[in-house]
Amino acid sequence: MASTPEAKVKKQIRKILEEMGAYYAMPIGTGYGNSGVPDFLVCSKGSFIGIEAKANAGKTTALQESHLSRIRGAGGTALVINEQNIDQLKGYLS
């Protein structure tokens, strides 16, 4: 299932979210959805968190940054998680 580097990051994120008891949904980017929405929409301990998963030194697109900025502007938290900072996610959710 986790064949690409980004898919491996997503698998690790899912595992952490499940371990921490967080609610999450993964919107599917289809013709009927909104492009640029974070990979994970999370509710943990009453807080809304948008998580964009990236592999290696992958950069967010302008559209993804726009969505992350809108989440922050609405009082939520927006994170970009990759292999280098994935351990910080568990600490953040604690």
Question: What does each model-identified segment do?
Answer:
Residues 1-94:
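Catalytic phosphate/metal-binding cores of nucleic-acid and nucleotide-processing enzymes, i.e., regions
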